């Protein structure tokens, strides 16, 4: 019996000595896809390097074996496999085959993450803040004062909260102007505007918008969701033009505002019309929320498949265990495809409805990604609804797209071939 135990112990020691890699599968076998991103972030933060195996088992992660890494998998409830050198080398060789649409990206440096969000309490959650917290990825909350004080270069990746960069407070005036949270939001923004010498909040928001544009031009990574996406581009197009009515800035909007818009300044959209009705819960014709006629049981969008070896950036941003993602509403739900600039890459769309849901582009040395909708795990998230409990959605395919964007800046850059 002692000999048997000795053999088993020696086998275990031998196996561990040759079990040199820890593979985190990201296909349907994974118990918690979202926490797997946080684990990978933590691993590279410890100074190790990680492989992002694009299109291999749902976009799996792999790194040299350490007992501490395995312990973290166990603590966080993440599925993993301990594999020997030979198996790892075979996987890498299979991925390198030019006949298969796979590639390996090296993740080296954890990005410094900033979330743009007001200090005043808002009656809605923010999907990115929720998933960063759940995945245990560290982030810093910043707002207009930090941006105006020049803090953006401290960060690699910036998320824009559910924000209205036009200075119209999300056009919530009609329904919520008597609510304490709305009044607090107005007061906070007016106070910051005055602090930096602006007479209108719209002027402050434009200055912030331009600072963010500089951040992207200098090599920053911008990610925005919901109303932060189209309102950002509207603010760029309306630079120097008054598009706010008196309840928002104390005087009337420029009657020629539409004709004066400059679409050459925007990231993603062109030829849109701004909403001139100050009481309408809509900013422009970019968003499909009020024009779409898609029943819930048919509300999905499909991710495009890109060449992993030739187009690694969009391939990273679309890694998922599902290619068809359940749709979800937001103040901005999706984008009319005919209003998207020709150079913008559409990564996810509802083709029958002619709407894009997930788009990407480059500006200067940086990149931006816009993702329509408010909460991937809540089909319609209303003002005042409780936050989503991601413990109930650990395998959300829609939330994975957010985390792809967080890890994307950690990748060692390869020269894009197309």
List the model feature ranges, each with a label.
Residues 14-16:
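N-terminal signal peptide c-region/cleavage motif recognized by signal peptidases
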Residues 19-126, 135, 373:
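Hydrophobic targeting/anchoring helices
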Residues 21-22, 27-31, 62, 66-71, ...:
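Helical hinge/lid and interdomain linker segments adjacent to catalytic or ligand-binding clefts
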Residues 106-109, 150-153, 215, 339, ...:
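Extracellular/periplasmic catalytic domains that process cell-envelope and extracellular macromolecules
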Residues 126, 133, 230, 260-383:
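Catalytic beta-strand/loop cores that center a nucleophilic Ser/Cys/Thr
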Residues 2-10:
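Sec-dependent signal peptide recognition
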Residues 182-183, 197-198, 217, 237-240, ...:
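Catalytic cores of eukaryotic secretory-pathway lumenal/extracellular enzymes that build
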Residues 20-62, 242, 340-418:
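Extracellular ligand-binding/catalytic regions of CAZymes and related secreted enzymes
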